Design a protein with these regions (language model features):
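C-terminal segment of classical bacterial N-terminal signal peptides
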Residues: 1-4
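Subset of outer-membrane beta-barrel
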Residues: 6-239
């Protein structure tokens, strides 16, 4: 029997850089330029080779001082995963791009796309294989007949829509939908390639200013559907 697994980045703190999941939310912030970076290391005490995730992104508004109806948003993103003893690694470079229409009384609607390139690799020579078993253990000096390096590179495309409303009292509301891997790029190596599941994301959040109690209530919701997998994250913060 042959089993298949897929690797794809997931961010639970999407509100820190929403364009990582929805290209339509690129450059919808109040600032003209933003920068985001994230580093995560997992299973430090359990595994000799830790699971590591890196993310870097930057966004900029274009034409907001010249266009009457809104502005263009442009971003650049880089994601990197390094996993386990086999050194399975992925590099993802994406360029989200959108247009934001400014509506009545600080309401905004945008459509965006995100083309990208995915590169994946693993080192087969540092693993153990069935023909290296000598009856007692695995002998790494025996040639495994496996390729010393496996790599693949594919294009991926995402798209989304986004709406945001700002209120005079400082409250706000936003909602969005996006779809990633629309072209279902291949994963796997050599003859064991298979298509990546398309990812569908719905997200909404808000900030409710309570002057009476002098704090801000910010509920958040995101749902992610990808093949047989479902993720639902609900939370809120108080400021």
């Amino acid at each position: 029997n042959i089993s298949f697994a897929q690797q794809d980045p997931h961010f639970s703190m999407w509100y820190s850089s929403p364009s990582l999941l929805n290209p339509a939310s690129t450059a919808t912030m109040e600032q003209d330029v933003t920068f985001f970076t994230n580093y995560r290391a997992q299973w430090l005490s359990a595994l000799p080779n830790q699971i590591r995730t890196n993310a870097v992104s930057a966004e900029i508004k274009l034409g907001n001082d010249r266009l009457r109806s809104g502005w263009f948003g442009l971003g650049a993103q880089y994601n990197n995963d390094a996993t386990g003893d086999a050194q399975i690694m992925s590099h993802i470079v994406s360029i989200p791009f959108n247009y934001v229409w400014e509506g009545y009384e600080k309401s905004y609607f945008s459509l965006g796309i995100k083309p990208g390139v995915i590169n994946r690799s693993l080192k087969a020579q540092i693993q153990t294989w069935d023909n290296q078993w000598n009856g007692i253990g695995f002998d790494n000096t025996v040639f495994s007949t496996e390729s010393s390096s496996n790599k693949n590179t594919h294009l991926t495309v995402g798209a989304g829509m986004y709406y945001k409303k700002l209120y005079r009292d400082g409250s706000k509301f936003d909602i969005g939908f996006s779809a990633n891997h629309l072209n279902a790029p291949e994963q796997g190596f050599r003859s064991l390639s298979f298509q990546t599941f398309r990812q569908y994301i719905f997200h909404t959040s808000g900030s409710i200013k309570l002057d009476r109690y002098k704090f801000l209530l910010s509920p958040q919701l995101i749902t992610m559907f990808q093949g047989p997998h479902r993720d639902v994250i609900i939370g809120t913060s108080f400021d």
